[in-house]
From Swiss-Prot:
Keywords: Aminoacyl-tRNA synthetase, ATP-binding, Coiled coil, Cytoplasm, Ligase, Nucleotide-binding, Protein biosynthesis. Belongs to the class-I aminoacyl-tRNA synthetase family. ValS type 1 subfamily. It comes from the Bacteria. Catalyzes the attachment of valine to tRNA(Val). As ValRS can inadvertently accommodate and process structurally similar amino acids such as threonine, to avoid such errors, it has a 'posttransfer' editing activity that hydrolyzes mischarged Thr-tRNA(Val) in a tRNA-dependent manner. A motif ('KMSKS' region) lies at residues 563-567. Monomer. Disulfide bonds: none annotated. This is Valine--tRNA ligase. InterPro entries: aa-tRNA-synth_I_CS (IPR001412), aa-tRNA-synth_Ia (IPR002300), Anticodon_Ia_Val (IPR033705), M/V/L/I-tRNA-synth_anticd-bd (IPR013155), Rossmann-like_a/b/a_fold (IPR014729), tRNA-bd_arm (IPR010978), tRNAsynth_Ia_anticodon-bd (IPR009080), Val-tRNA_synth_C_sf (IPR037118). It is an enzyme of class 6 (ligase). The gene is valS.
Length: 939
């Protein structure tokens, strides 16, 4: 074979760019909204324009591309819309840091327009990198439909959706206790807050009862908020305090008189049984305050400092104010004690700041009217969630859903399309271009709301905006909406998935997708090194890479699987992996790990393993090419003579058909790991390690006729074409490269059909590319009765020979001489002998009536067939030991099955087929044992 035509080694770098350019030039990725084919559409979860792709992006886009390529080959009109997300808080934060580092300036040093220009510049650069990386990964997106969550179409959709909900009264504005990030100075939705268990203190503080010498003591984790206290609450059933309900106490430092109230929400066993109520700075207190119509006093500025309501503590940070208040309380004799206490603390998922419950005027979406439909879509299976165990999580979250705070105090994002009158409370919601007519007439009297919408508001409309909504005449919308499936991580089931269902169904009264597949989160291996004091730090750099490659860990270093994080040193860059291993190896690794919603443990060994498989695929194909290079597609068109097919040929065709059936089922339930495993095993084990090894003597002219050799070559070409089709959705680059080589080698037949064996392969060769070839279908032949049982016996005979070779410590390269004794299954043995020779490393196999008397041999029994291997004289003792071990094993098995069959309970209750199977097993074991005993006697 010419080295230039088919290099010995596969080099991903030299082929991937060219293959992708070929796909793009051919226009294969572009969907046709006017096509009569059934539609299959996916909208890409848009990566944030904050930086570059991470391994999570590589995973989710590999899975989507696998589905898209599979459905494209099945004849669907596929449309995969790529896009990027403006990611309000995240992107603004990144750009602010960039400007601080590069120019030494804060956001507030710029006008809003100037700052946004910097953000748009950042977005362009980041987006270009992201889209380039998606191409490297092999994503077959329709780039002509590329979207951005703040492009003009998205902006129209967002304004339209806001106005629809505003006009229905679903969107409202009001004061509410929100999650406030004092660093980013914006409100966050409940699910944007992460909770951490932190050690702190429980402070005990005394309040003096008005007109009394009595004091009431409360326990609190936040003494600084006493400046905003508006009540003390006790349980009405707590006899210690029942006489004080209705009395008043004085709040220290601000001298405010507040009531002692009875409320059944108070836990009398916590602290002293009395709690301070600060409605403006605690969510539970807010509810109590609403129930008792208490004043709500905000004591903090947006930056987290004490405001003018804090008296002498005005201007202090929360932390400093806490210390000063405790000191001052001690001086007044009002501080009792503090106790160590652990509590859950809310933390901003973006800035890491401790969240402050903060009374603020914000925009909200009322969710009560959507709750039934959100449940209904899933309960009726109009939306199917995979894996199904997440259905319960979804429904629990919907049942506990609270009004959604959608306003953010940012500059980057969709500006809220509402104008406020400067002189009264009038507002105008406007979804057109420019501004409302009233504003145009009198611009000095109006101002647009300065806030922007939560990123998830625009992301919630993503499936609609990608296909042209609110233009209801959009061909894309009619053809491709709703989409087929949403593929995403289970961590944003509530962030995004539920909001898409809410927003899209509110606009068009239809679910946005039929299925949701939630993959697991990627974990990487990190290494913690402990010092003598028991303190630890993360190992990084060369040492970590050495450990990743298998270097033994010292006693003070512990490996742990953790979520990917730069600080932990366990981040794996997908682009670095593509450069090192090739895109196909990366994709196959990710698919093989993509379990259903569980933790995904990813390390370098997996990339190495699947790179080796890619090389195996190349080398296996290269071997096959060497034996089919003289064939043409016309030879395939002629078909094969099925009378010349052997047991091994029927076996590989049966295995291939079974592979297709299993893979189709796994695609339907998104079991990507099983799809990858099945395809991997078929090519590596069934095709290469088994079938190719069996037929090598025929291919090399050492056995069988020329006609049989020609038949096997046609079958090899057919199998290679088909398995490339099966593998293509997962490993598209190498399969396309090999497919094009097949087309160049075999040529194409314009109208040829082939037969039931070769026909589909001939059809595939007529395709321009592997990615648009029709997906493989079962190959129909007249399979012999008992095929699987017969080949199974052949495999067990091979295993027995290999086992004897291993136990006798025979040289693996030494050809063996074997014999078979079977009066009942002579024809089956004749068929099995070539397989035994090829896979068992046996030079000759003779069928005998009885064991040779003048030879030393080792014997095994399979289904009543005795198989023996001739041994050198020095192996006599080893054979006796082996037979004794086999005798012990069989005696234990016979004893166990005999006891089971002696049980009347088993015989009467068990399935009759199971009882019969046990009887057959017992007979076979007894026969094998007798053979072993005879052999031992002869020794």
């Amino acid at each position: 074979m010419n080295e230039d035509q088919f290099p010995k080694a596969y080099d991903p770098k030299s082929s991937e760019t060219g293959v992708y350019s070929f796909w793009e030039r051919s226009g294969i990725f572009v969907a046709n909204a006017s096509s009569e084919k059934p539609a299959y559409s996916i909208v890409m979860p848009p990566p944030n324009v904050t930086g570059i792709l991470h391994m999570g992006h590589a995973l989710v886009n590999t899975l989507q591309d696998t589905l898209i390529r599979y459905k494209r080959m099945q004849g669907f009109e596929v449309c995969w819309v790529p896009g990027t997300d403006h990611a309000g808080i995240a992107t603004q934060t990144v750009v602010e840091r960039h400007l601080k580092a590069s120019l030494g300036k804060q956001r507030t040093d710029f006008s809003r327009e100037e700052f946004l220009k910097h953000v748009w510049d950042w977005k362009e650069k980041s987006q270009n990198v992201i889209l380039s990386q998606l191409r490297q990964l092999g994503c077959s997106c329709d780039w002509s439909r590329q979207r951005f969550t703040m492009d003009p179409g998205a902006n129209r959709a967002v304004k339209k959706a806001f106005k629809i909900l505003f006009d229905k009264g679903v969107i409202y504005r009001g004061y509410y206790l929100v999650n406030w990030d004092p660093i980013l100075q914006t409100a966050l939705a409940d699910d944007e807050v992460e909770y951490e268990e932190r050690d702190g203190w429980l402070y005990y503080i005394r309040y003096q009862v008005v007109n009394s010498e009595e004091f009431i003591t409360v326990a609190t984790t936040r003494p600084e908020t006493l400046l905003g206290d508006t009540a003390i609450a006790v349980s009405p059933e707590d006899l210690r305090y029942s006489h004080l309900i209705g009395a008043k106490v004085v709040v220290p430092f601000v001298n405010r008189e507040i009531p002692i109230i009875g409320d059944f929400s108070v836990d009398a066993s916590f602290g002293t049984g009395a709690v301070k109520i600060t409605p403006a700075h605690d969510k539970d207190d807010y509810k109590t305050g609403m129930n008792h119509q208490l004043p709500m006093i905000n004591i903090l500025t947006p930056t987290g400092e004490i405001n003018e309501n804090g008296g002498i503590f005005t201007g202090l940070s929360r932390e400093v104010a806490r210390e000063n208040i405790i000191t001052s309380l001690e001086a007044l004799g009002l501080f009792v004690k503090k106790e160590a206490y652990s509590s859950r603390v809310g933390v901003s998922y973006r800035s890491g700041a401790i969240i402050e419950p903060y009374l603020s005027k914000q925009w909200f979406v009322s969710v009560d009217s959507f709750r039934d439909s959100l449940r209904g879509f899933v309960n009726s299976e109009e939306i199917r969630i995979f894996p199904p165990e997440f259905v319960r999580n979804y429904l629990t979250w919907v049942n506990n859903l609270k009004d959604w705070c959608i306003s953010r105090q940012l500059w980057w994002g969709h500006r809220i399309p509402v104008w406020h009158n400067k002189h009264d409370e009038n507002v105008i919601c406007f979804d057109g271009e420019g501004g409302p007519e009233e504003v145009m007439r009198d611009p000095e009297s109006w101002y647009q709301d300065p806030d922007v919408l939560d990123t998830w508001f625009s992301s919630g409309l993503w499936p609609l905006t990608c296909f042209g909504w609110p233009d209801e005449n959009s061909l894309d919308l009619k053809k491709f909406y709703p989409t087929a499936v949403l593929v995403t991580g289970h961590d944003i089931l509530f962030f995004w998935v539920t909001r898409m269902v809410l927003m899209c169904s509110a606009m068009v009264d239809t679910e946005p997708f039929s299925d949701v597949f939630l993959h697991g989160l990627i974990f990487g291996k990190s290494y913690r090194e402990y010092d003598e004091k028991g303190e630890w730090f993360y190992v990084s750099g060369e040492r970590k890479r050495d450990y990743d490659k298998g270097k033994a860990l010292p006693k003070n270093v512990v490996a742990k699987w953790e979520k990917l994080s730069k600080s932990k040193g366990n981040v794996i860059d997908p682009i670095e992996m593509i450069e090192a291993y090739g895109a196909d190896a990366v994709r196959l690794t990710l698919c093989s790990c993509a379990n259903r919603g569980e933790q995904i443990d990813l390390d370098y060994h997996l990339f190495e393993e699947y790179k080796n498989f890619i090389n195996k695929l190349w080398n296996g194909a290269r071997f096959i090419f060497g034996h089919i290079s003289e064939l043409t597609s016309r030879d395939l068109e002629e078909g094969v003579n099925q009378d010349l097919l052997g047991l091994e040929d029927f076996y590989i065709l049966d295995r291939f058909n079974e592979l297709l059936d299993l893979i189709d089922g796994h695609y339907n339930c998104y079991s990507f790991d099983k799809i990858a495993s099945l395809a991997y095993d078929f090519f590596k084990n069934d095709l290469c390690s088994t079938y190719l090894e069996i037929i090598k003597p025929t291919l090399f002219g050492k056995q069988d006729s020329d006609q049989q050799r020609a038949t096997k070559r046609k079958l090899l070409a057919t199998l290679l074409i088909n398995i490339l089709g099966v593998l293509h959705p997962i490993v598209p680059y190498i399969t396309e490269t090999l497919f094009q080589k097949l087309k160049a080698t075999l040529g194409t037949v314009e109208n040829g059909k082939g037969d039931s064996v070769t026909g589909h392969a001939v059809s595939m060769l007529r395709s321009e590319a592997c990615m648009v070839a029709e997906y493989p279908k079962p190959i129909h032949v007249a399979f012999p009765q008992g095929l699987r049982e017969s080949f199974g016996i052949a495999e067990r005979l091979v295993y027995t020979i290999r086992n004897i070779r291993g136990e006798m410590q025979l040289d693996p390269r030494e050809p063996l001489q074997a014999f078979v004794i079977s009066s009942e299954k002579k024809e089956l043995v004749d068929v099995c002998i070539p397989i035994m020779c090829a896979l068992g490393g046996v030079k000759t196999v003779e069928q005998l009536a009885e064991a040779p008397k003048d030879s030393i041999f080792s014997l095994g029994v399979v289904e009543g067939i005795q198989v023996g291997v001739i041994l050198p004289p020095e192996h006599l003792a080893k054979e006796r030991v082996r037979l004794e071990k086999e005798k012990t094993r069989l005696e234990k098995s016979i004893d166990s099955v005999s006891k089971l069959l002696a049980s009347e309970d088993f015989r009467t209750r068990a399935n009759p087929s199971l009882v019969q199977a046990k009887k057959d097993s017992l007979r076979n074991s007894q026969r094998e044992l007798q053979s072993i005993l005879d052999k031992l006697a002869s020794l």
